[in-house]
Amino acid sequence: WAGKSFGFVQVPRIGQEVVVDFLEGDPDQPLITGRVYNAEQMPPWDLPANATQSGVLSRSSKGGGYGNANALRFEDKKGSEQVWLHAEKNQDIEVENDETHWVGHDRTKTIDHDETVHVKHDRTETVDNNETITIGVDRTESVGSNESITIGSNRTETVGVDESITIGANRTEAVGSNETISIGSNRSVTVG
């Protein structure tokens, strides 16, 4: 597949066995039409054990070892179907318009270092059941304008050491029924 500034490109590597044709039978116009495996250049996945697997696996250029490769593999074994994508280093995905993901069961995501998410417009997140967030060290949250929190039932907040609350202007607190305050030592209130 070849066109003006588009098409499929895969340059043969040194040592590969190629299939050569000749334009109009002219030996001065050789054309590589394909490549084949041989005893020294075997497929990336063992056969016949992995006969249900197909895909593309490249090798890193000079200086890379056997385990250095980019790969896209399809496993079509009934009950074990899988699409496996491996980037030897970076992976960059660009979507010019919308992107949709659907996962029929569970999803697990692990990031060994940092993550940055930048949403330039609105964001909506819905969890139909429970949510648990665990933060190993500190957390900072900044809201540029207003914040509203609605809790349908009870709320429990526990602070292990100190807590400081600063309100720049007014504060209104309404308790629909009873309120109990327990202070282990001193309390100081200053008005004005």
Language model region names:
Residues W1-G192:
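Structural signature for extended repeat/solenoid scaffolds and their inter-repeat hinge/linker regions
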